[in-house]
Amino acid sequence: MTKFIFVTGGVVSSLGKGITAASLGRLLKDRGLSVTIQKFDPYLNVDPGTMSPYQHGEVFVTDDGAETDLDLGHYERFIDINLNKYSNVTAGKVYSHVLKKERRGDYLGGTVQVIPHITNEIKERLLLAGESTNADVVITEIGGTTGDIESLPFIEAIRQIRSDLSRENVMYIHCTLLPFIKAAGEMKTKPTQHSVKELRGLGIQPDLIVVRTEYEMTQDLKDKIALFCDIPEQNVIECRDAESLYEIPLQLSKQHMDDLVIKRLDLNAKYDTQLDEWKHLLDVVNHLDGEITIGLVGKYVSLQDAYLSVVEALKHAGYPLHKDINVKWIDSSEVTDENAAEFLKDVDGILVPGGFGYRASEGKISAIRYARENNVPYFGICLGMQLATVEFARNVLGLEGAHSAELDPETPYPVIDLLPEQKDIEDLGGTLRLGLYPSEVKEGTLAYDIYGKKEIEERHRHRYEFNNDYREQMEDNGLVFSGVSPDGRRIEMVELPKNDFFFACQFHPEFLSRPNRPQPIFKAFIEAANKYKEAKENK
């Protein structure tokens, strides 16, 4: 039977519940267990797809096209699995589904209430995560902080699930903060005690407590937490601040967290903990030699979580070269043709990531022009590909005023236009072209050199696409369309052979990058940036 582990958090937000859950998933997977993981978010949006990146950070897209919380990116990268739409459940999605059922008459005229209707819907979503994957273990992170009013239905649902499935199939892990009071010169356990008391008041006794701390815990502190929170001392796990997120699984393993979980749930682990691959990765991360500077030109750079998967993918690509990636954050609203060199003269590569809306788009186009004209390695993702074709149309083809129809509906040259199937859609939420789609790669191109095969699959998130009316004209002037959809209708990749590395794609390759397996385009881009840097230094 599938076992269920619930990870809750107390005291403050941003404790690292997601990293804790992902790290535990990695440990259990390395013991030969199949693991899936999900996030319950208590906000009332149906999904984060229409939320501002300033509010939420990046939107992570799964293979089956779900727009989800960025924590799912951590889950996939740590555990090296591909998640599905059941891996992110919001209060908005739950309430919306319950209300649709009520309108259909599914409740036979009964009064619809939080208990049992909302809690039952939450439990159904929880069980679907296990049923859709046949996993040995489902790890569920509960978003928010214990005691938050909006998360109470989720807490109640996971309390009930213990009775539904029996105690031996359910485990609760609670993450708390152990603050250091500088004036007193000591760490305080009281916030942890009160957080656990709050959780117990809601009917949940944690089996294991993960304590986030800046400094090493003494045995006395562990004993005190164990006493007041009514758990064995060995079930108090220290989680120290770390320079690299990839240290966390090893921290937890040293304290036998996986052994405690396996024993508590009577899991049939096939192997002892080795983590050799993870230890090798961490050894590489801790011994990087030199750095490569990438100019990331975007409009949400004041909140770096808006580009989290892109940055992680860049780092992954640096590891085989033993290079650290220094991301230079460049606000595209400040970039113009006249000052682009000031912003970009010191970078080894330029990346324009995905985005929406007209604001700050001209600065991205200026950065792309600088990269093309100065032979600086360029990599464009989604909007970064669309604007690369806009820049080419304006400055190579001479089509003054060329633009994307999304950004300038009145443009005389709509190089980028609305997807045909989007013409009659009015709603914004959940209506993009989303998820994993195949592409065909043209032989004899940089794209083929990168992937080494004729067919690939990557994740997409877009509403607009390249307008094929301009394809022949661009090809005649040197732009190569190296990747297309299987029907040949949609452009997926473009490149400029006369430059050392000028490459862009409509899809989001960052979502499939792994720390031990860099995504091929990112790997090629960082290799090109490294060569560019070495050439500059040897001049």
Curated annotation (Swiss-Prot):
L-glutamine binds at residues 54, 355, 383-386, 406, 463. Homotetramer. It catalyses: UTP + L-glutamine + ATP + H2O = CTP + L-glutamate + ADP + phosphate + 2 H(+); L-glutamine + H2O = L-glutamate + NH4(+); UTP + NH4(+) + ATP = CTP + ADP + phosphate + 2 H(+). PROSITE patterns: GATASE_TYPE_1 (PS51273). Catalyzes the ATP-dependent amination of UTP to CTP with either L-glutamine or ammonia as the source of nitrogen. Regulates intracellular CTP levels through interactions with the four ribonucleotide triphosphates. CTP binds at residues 13, 148-150, 188-193, 224. Transmembrane segments: none annotated. Its EC number is 6.3.4.2. CTPSs have evolved a hybrid strategy for distinguishing between UTP and CTP. The overlapping regions of the product feedback inhibitory and substrate sites recognize a common feature in both compounds, the triphosphate moiety. To differentiate isosteric substrate and product pyrimidine rings, an additional pocket far from the expected kinase/ligase catalytic site, specifically recognizes the cytosine and ribose portions of the product inhibitor. Pfam families: CTP_synth_N, GATase. One of its GO terms (biological process) is pyrimidine nucleobase biosynthetic process. Keywords: ATP-binding, Glutamine amidotransferase, Ligase, Magnesium, Metal-binding, Nucleotide-binding, Pyrimidine biosynthesis. Allosterically activated by GTP, when glutamine is the substrate; GTP has no effect on the reaction when ammonia is the substrate. The allosteric effector GTP functions by stabilizing the protein conformation that binds the tetrahedral intermediate(s) formed during glutamine hydrolysis. Inhibited by the product CTP, via allosteric rather than competitive inhibition. Belongs to the CTP synthase family. Gene3D superfamilies: 3.40.50.880, P-loop containing nucleotide triphosphate hydrolases. It comes from the Bacteria. ATP binds at residues 14-19, 71, 240-242. The keyword Aminoacyl-tRNA synthetase does not apply. GO terms for cellular component: cytosol. This is CTP synthase. Mg(2+) binds at residues 71, 141. Residues 293-535 form the Glutamine amidotransferase type-1 domain. The active site is at 382 (nucleophile), 508, 510. It is an enzyme of class 6 (ligase).
